[in-house]
Every structure is written in C-alpha cells, then in structure tokens.
Regions:
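Catalytic machinery of carbohydrate-active enzymes
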Residues: 1-347
Length: 347
C-alpha cells in the first residue's frame, strides 16, 4: 500500500515531543511527497509548528471525538510514539489502514495496532531519540541513526519577536538559566546557579536571564532569592508563552538547564546548550542528553544514594557538577562569540 499521510502522536511532555521530531525529517528523506501531521498537547503545539518537516499540527484538546477525526481525515498511517489507549481505539474504529504502536507489555496495542513493534525503553542503553526510530520499522526503515547524525535532522524556522529582541539587545552575551524542571527530572542545586551567576558578575558582557513558569519563579524567590537580586540577572519567569520562550532561546546566546523541555528545545534549535544530568540509568545523558550541533551534557560518575530516591529534587551526583565546570564552558562560549564578531567585523 502506498502511504500518503502519516500522523505521529506524542501527547506527553515538550522534551519527549522534541526528541520525536527527528522522525519527521527522516521520513521525508525516504518519502519526500508524504504529508506528515503531528498530534500533541496544546501547550507543546507552538514548538512543533516551528518545525518545517511537520506539515500540520493537531492539538489533542481539539479532538472531542478522535474516532470521527480519524474517519474524516485522509490519514492512512498512524504512529503512536507514546502509549495512548483512547487514540489507539479511535484509529482502530476508524479503520486507519496502518496503525503502529509499541506492543511490549501493552495489551491494547497488541489488539488495536496492526503493525506492532516491540521494544523496551527502561532497559535500553539507547537514547530516547534513537528509540523512537524503532517505530519506523513497519515502513521498511530499519536504520537507527547514530547520535551524531540526529542534530542535522532538526529543521526549525523560528521567528524574531521585536519585543524580545529589544530586551536582549543591550547585552553582548545573553545567557539563559532554566533552573527548575517542573518535577520532570533531577535539578542542579539552586545554590549552584547562585554561585555561577555571582561569579559571572565579573564578566560585564554576560547578562543572565532566568526562565521558568510563574510557580517556579515563586519557588526561586523563596529559596534562591539572591539569584534574582544579582545586578547581572533578570527574572522573566511566568512572563513568556512557550512560543515566546522558543523565540527567546533562539535569539539568546546560550542556555543552561537540567533534563527538561527547554533544554531539548535549545539543543534542537542549534543554540549553545549545557545539559546537567545525574548518572542514574533512567535519567543519565546517554538516555536523555541534549542533542544539538552546539549542545553538550555534563554528568559525574559518583556513588550516589540519592539517585535511588524516585522523586528527589537533586542528588549528590548533580552536586558533583561544579559551578566552575559550567563557568569554564560559558567563558569558552563568550570567547567564541567575540572571535566570530571580530572575524565578521574585519571581513
């Protein structure tokens, strides 16, 4: 059967969504004329719309009747890149010809998906972005790219927003701190962000912007107030939509975060990015590291009892990544930008 319209469903967090987007570029390489739609939650949709290898974005919240949506569409292939029984049942009822889902330990995908794949995420040594490529096997695509290949599969067209550009314009190097993770991963200690920002006061060219939700901004005000009071720091927590945050990250000069959605956005956009990770198997950079042409991940191998505590905010292996290590990379970034400006100025 000739495939003409694929829908990829990923309705969880923004980081997971970003790590699924390389599939769209790889499918386009093999089937250039194919239409690719992407179904995600409304809050993640603005970032997916900036991806040029996605032809249409459907917001999960807009589907009051998923079965009717599938029946009325021309979608002939659906990839459930995340377990979702409601959508799997709907595609089955609508008789979508090709329904791909992971049937490993999942009875409803055995029943409702007629092109099942079988793999485990938790026990795998592969990166999350690589695991997603296993969904392409029923399409005849068995290649799983090396990590070094994936950054080239990100294609974004992110607009400039004049108000945001104006905020950044007075400073030569705009560095984003995204200290919190919305409870989705281990965090670098907030006092380390304070130490790093305090040390960067000595670099007049660098200005720090703290991003996050309004609730995260409130947490920082209560637990890391010194960070928000430093003269080289501006707090924009709760002031940006996700679409604006994407524009802000793209227009800045670098970002530092733990394994959270904005980290993966920054890396995918090609921004200078530092990801800070624990060593626990389910959270380490081999599984969730930042993937981008200017991204790098830091992690320290230590005997960390805190890694075994499921919902710990931080742990000893995160504390073993020092502010001095991170600052060294930031200063290298600053030198790189200065050199680039000198080269373009003399050209």
């Amino acid at each position: 059967m000739a495939i003409s319209h694929i829908l990829i469903c990923r309705t969880d967090n923004i980081g997971d969504v970003v790590l699924t987007l390389p599939l769209t570029a790889y499918i386009k390489q093999h089937f250039p004329e194919i239409k690719i739609s992407f179904l995600c939650r409304a809050y993640a949709a603005p970032v997916v719309r900036y991806c040029t290898t996605v032809d249409a974005v459907i917001e999960m919240e807009s589907l009051s009747d998923p079965a009717a949506f599938f029946a009325q569409s021309d979608i002939d292939t659906v990839i459930f890149a995340q377990l979702d029984k409601r959508l799997a049942v709907a595609a089955y009822k609508a008789r979508v010809p090709v329904r791909i889902g992971n049937a490993y330990r999942t009875w409803f995908n055995w029943w409702y998906c007629n092109r099942p794949v079988h793999f485990t995420r938790g026990g795998s040594d592969s990166h999350e972005a690589q695991l997603n490529f296993k969904y392409l096997r029923p399409l005849g695509i068995r290649h799983v790219p090396k990590l070094a290949e994936i950054p080239a599969m990100y294609h974004f067209k992110i607009p400039h927003e004049a108000a945001l550009d104006q905020m950044l314009q007075p400073y030569r190097f705009n560095l984003i701190f995204h200290p919190k993770s919305n409870g989705h991963g281990r965090e670098w200690p907030s006092d380390y962000f304070v130490q790093l920002a305090r040390s960067l006061v000595r670099q007049p060219d660098i200005h720090v912007w703290v991003t996050g939700s309004a609730a995260e901004g409130q947490w920082l005000a209560e637990h890391a107030s010194e960070l928000l009071q430093l003269p080289n720091v501006s707090n924009v927590c709760g002031q940006l939509t996700l679409a604006q945050l994407a524009c802000f990250i793209n227009a800045a000069d670098g970002l530092i975060a733990s394994g959270t959605g904005p980290l993966h956005m920054s890396a995918a956009f090609g921004q200078r990015t530092i990801g800070l990770f624990p060593t626990a198997r389910s959270m380490h950079p081999g599984r969730w590291g930042a993937l981008g042409r200017r991204a790098q991940s830091l992690s320290q191998t230590v005997n960390c009892a805190g890694c075994k505590i499921k919902h710990a905010m931080t742990c000893e292996c995160m504390r073993s990544i020092t502010p001095e290590q991170v600052e060294k990379i930031v200063l290298e970034w600053l030198d790189q930008k200065r050199n680039q400006q000198q080269i373009s100025g003399s050209a």
